[in-house]
Regions:
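Short, solvent-exposed loop/beta-turn-alpha elements that line the ligand-binding surface or hinge
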Residues: 106-121, 165-167, 207-232, 279-280, ...
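Extracytoplasmic "Venus flytrap"
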Residues: 26-44, 62-65, 144, 196
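Extracytoplasmic "Venus flytrap"/periplasmic binding protein-like
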Residues: 43, 47-121, 157-159, 258, ...
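Extracytoplasmic/periplasmic solute-binding protein
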Residues: 132-141, 146, 156, 170-222, ...
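Short, well-ordered beta-strand elements
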Residues: 24-35, 55-60, 84, 137
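Extracytoplasmic/periplasmic substrate-binding proteins
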Residues: 32, 200, 205-207, 231-292
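Glycine-centered hinge/linker elements that transmit conformational signals in sensory
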Residues: 173-179, 216-249
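Hinge/lid segment of periplasmic solute-binding proteins
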Residues: 88-147, 173, 199-203
Length: 292
């Protein structure tokens, strides 16, 4: 978000609270940006704060996305919710179902006098943040996608082509076998399992993840992850785990650190991991599309 947009959006949000006249309006911005992205968020807020005297944005790191989301829900119920909350995309649907919890971003922009055109966003991204009636509810910010990360140095050492990452799941299994023979105790892992191995897996194969337009068209939806394709995929991962080719490293993004450190040679996760790899890893990392 540009600083001007942030200023006007903050101005609109500040209408929700009663503050003394002439007082500087403080805007609480809860987020889940850690590391380099956290530094960027702090810099973004500082740049805006230094540009004017009427508003002060206070960025507050609240932990992982689930932790931030839970904290925001608790704060809302207690009557002291933050003005701005940055969480993962799936938070939009939950907030959409919670009447009165949020003000749609289109309304915030309109109140603030900001020209706002949701159509400028990539449709696949905008869909995450938009209600069935076409109204954008939340603002795409630092959106990421699921990708395949791999250690090019480990590939070379295992006799694999570092410029040809596996593009299919059978190829992932074969690459993992070569990495295991080369001495890797964790050839392949994954973070955000439900996102990478179910939701994105479904989209990549053009199959349904949940009924009712992925839940946007009604609360009586159900997950559709018990199809033969999904069952076969999870069984293949289980088989790889039994062979020591796939190693589970915990929930959410716990596996990310094991890839950055070089412990695990391949992983599926967020494209946001790229920054940590470039900054902290002692190996050359590669990125490719999800396997199919």
């Amino acid at each position: 978000m540009k600083l001007k947009s942030l200023a006007l959006a903050a101005s609109a949000c500040s209408l929700l609270v009663a503050l003394p006249a002439q007082a500087q309006t403080e805007i609480q911005w809860w987020h889940s940006m850690s590391g380099q992205l956290g530094e960027w968020v702090n810099g973004l807020a500082k740049g805006f704060n230094d540009s004017q005297k009427d508003y002060k944005v206070v960025p507050v790191f609240k932990g992982t996305y689930p932790e931030s989301f839970a904290a925001a829900i608790a704060a809302f119920r207690a009557g002291n919710a933050p003005h701005i909350l940055q969480v993962f995309e799936v938070g939009t649907a939950s907030m959409m179902a919670s009447k009165g919890a949020i003000i749609p971003v289109t309304e915030v922009m309109k109140t603030g006098g900001v020209k706002f055109d949701p159509s400028v966003y990539v449709p696949a991204v905008a869909g995450y943040y938009t209600a069935p009636n076409g109204q954008m509810l939340s603002l795409p910010f630092n959106s990421s996608t699921t990708v395949f990360h791999y250690n090019k140095d480990a590939f070379k050492a295992a006799g694999l082509d570092p410029d040809k990452p596996p593009t299919t799941w059978p190829e992932v299994a074969r690459a993992a076998a070569s990495l295991k023979i080369a001495g890797h105790k964790c050839p392949f892992t994954t973070s955000w399992q439900s996102w990478t191995q179910l939701e994105s897996f479904s989209a990549w194969h053009n199959v349904e993840f949940a009924t009712k337009n992925n839940g946007f068209n009604g609360l009586d939806t159900r997950l559709a992850v018990d199809t033969p394709l999904h069952v076969r995929h999870i069984q293949n991962l289980a088989n790889m785990a039994q062979q020591g080719l796939f190693v589970y490293k915990g929930r959410n993004n716990s596996a990310d650190a094991t890839f950055v450190s070089g412990e695990c040679a391949m992983t599926t996760g967020s494209s946001a991991l790229y920054g940590a790899v470039k900054r902290n890893s002692k190996f050359t990392g590669g990125i490719s599309t999800l396997p199919y």
